[in-house]
């Protein structure tokens, strides 16, 4: 089969409430959000009805496990049930290619990865929930019409920036890049942040630091693991801090005059990304907190404070406290980042630790190193790893690239060699040498 001439693309994304629209002729009322809006309301309603039918049918065979994936000739669907009565369905078109002597166009049904689709739909919900709270909670406080308006203004810009043909292993792993620090550097950074915390907590007890990032690497976090991942993803993938800091499509959440979170273009700014009167609220631990992000050079500092304490927080004093000793801290991080870059230039690899979500790789997501064949193989290997605790796989691609993948306990390691003339024994020896010399630390606690 030739390379697909039409890539994977979005078919539709819908959020619906199953308890609405129970009377005949009102089924369309179930729909809380549908994209793209160019699909007429009849087809939108049919899509919801088909999803409900699949869920009810599969419950007969697995009452405790809702239907998660549906595969058809033309499309692949992922279904998420994040809240009682709330369902989210993401449908993408399968890619097409030319087959046979008659150059007939055919759908390629096995190209779309289930894990990637599920991770994508989970990220959509988690981002919504972080900045808005749960859908049903909002509905109970306001109305379903208000929920529809909020979903339209918040989810639509988010889903428009997703490139469905470029989702890859990094999407599936959903990890966090950490910058390795020695003890002295760690204590220096911690001392800098702690001094700011203590200064303001003496009068505003709810004030606390949340995250410290340098470029696209996490340095410190005071948050629960999943909260860290969600806010890290927001800063890296939407705000585009780090290597993509000058990206033209970066977006940031701010509160409008009605205290409703909306997306806006980030722009270029040094200091506070959002001013005090427009700070967004994030729902962490079941309660809203104002999120303050401070940017200086390549360092990003995130702080949290209870909304009731926010009016008493002097932004000018906070800025002055952050500027103090900042140059030394930024220089220290810059030096350690350079050492990491030196190390990473020697191999093409991806390492992931499921226990702490640490991901390490010199390969840029959606970068040229991950062509379609490589992406597909990496996704398939990862899916195999999901079913077992330990394994090792060696594959040679049609383009003569060797891929070696290992899973030990909760760690995954993928390394690629473009040595087309090497034998499998030579590649195996190369992996042993590389692991012993450079990657031994990856498989030790």
Curated annotation (Swiss-Prot):
Secretion signal span: none
Any one cellular-component term (Gene Ontology): Mon1-Ccz1 complex
Pfam families for the chain: Intu_longin_1 (PF19031), Intu_longin_3 (PF19033)
Domain of life: Eukaryota
One of the GO biological process terms: vesicle-mediated transport
InterPro entries the UniProt entry points to: Ccz1, CCZ1/INTU/HSP4_longin_1, CCZ1/INTU/HSP4_longin_3
Family: Belongs to the CCZ1 family.
Protein name: Vacuolar fusion protein CCZ1 homolog
Organism taxonomic ancestry: Eukaryota, Amoebozoa, Evosea, Eumycetozoa, Dictyostelia
């Amino acid at each position: 089969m030739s390379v697909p001439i039409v890539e994977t693309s979005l078919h539709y994304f819908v959020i619906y409430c199953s308890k609405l629209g129970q009377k005949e002729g009102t089924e369309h009322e179930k729909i809380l959000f549908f994209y793209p809006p160019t699909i007429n309301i009849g087809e939108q309603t049919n899509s919801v009805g088909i999803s409900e039918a699949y869920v009810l049918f599969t419950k007969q065979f697995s009452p405790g496990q809702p239907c998660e994936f549906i595969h058809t000739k033309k499309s692949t669907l992922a279904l998420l049930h994040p809240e009682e009565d709330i369902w989210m369905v993401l449908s993408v078109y399968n890619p097409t290619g030319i087959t046979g002597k008659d150059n007939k166009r055919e759908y390629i049904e096995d190209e779309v990865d289930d894990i990637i689709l599920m991770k994508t739909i989970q990220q959509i919900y988690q981002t919504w929930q972080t900045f808005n709270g749960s859908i049903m909670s909002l509905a109970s406080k306001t109305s379903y019409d208000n929920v529809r308006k909020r979903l339209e203004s918040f989810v639509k810009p988010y889903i428009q920036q997703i490139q469905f043909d470029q989702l890859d292993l990094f999407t599936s792993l959903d990890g966090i890049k950490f910058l390795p620090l020695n003890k002295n550097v760690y204590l220096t950074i911690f001392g800098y942040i702690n001094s700011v915390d203590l200064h303001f907590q003496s009068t505003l007890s709810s004030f606390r630091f949340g995250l410290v990032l340098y470029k696209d690497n996490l340095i410190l976090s005071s948050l629960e693991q999943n909260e860290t991942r969600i806010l890290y993803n927001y800063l890296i993938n939407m705000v585009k801090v780090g290597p993509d800091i000058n990206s033209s499509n970066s977006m940031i959440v701010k509160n409008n005059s009605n205290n409703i979170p909306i997306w806006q273009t980030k722009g270029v700014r040094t200091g506070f990304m959002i001013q005090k009167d427009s700070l967004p609220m994030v729902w962490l631990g079941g309660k809203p907190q104002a999120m303050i992000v401070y940017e200086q050079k390549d360092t990003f500092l995130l702080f949290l404070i209870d909304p009731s304490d926010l009016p008493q927080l002097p932004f000018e004093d906070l800025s002055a406290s952050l500027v103090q000793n900042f140059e030394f801290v930024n220089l220290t991080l810059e030096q350690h980042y350079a050492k990491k870059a030196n190390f990473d230039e020697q191999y093409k690899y991806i390492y992931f630790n499921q226990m702490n979500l640490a991901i390490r790789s010199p390969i840029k997501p959606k970068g040229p190193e991950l062509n379609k064949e490589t992406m597909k193989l990496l996704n398939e290997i990862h899916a195999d790893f999901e079913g077992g605790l330990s394994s090792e796989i060696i594959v040679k691609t049609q383009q003569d690239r060797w891929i070696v993948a290992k899973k030990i306990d909760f760690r995954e390691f993928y390394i690629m060699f473009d040595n087309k003339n090497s034998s499998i024994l030579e590649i195996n020896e190369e992996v042993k040498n590389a692991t012993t010399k450079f990657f031994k630390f990856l498989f030790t606690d």
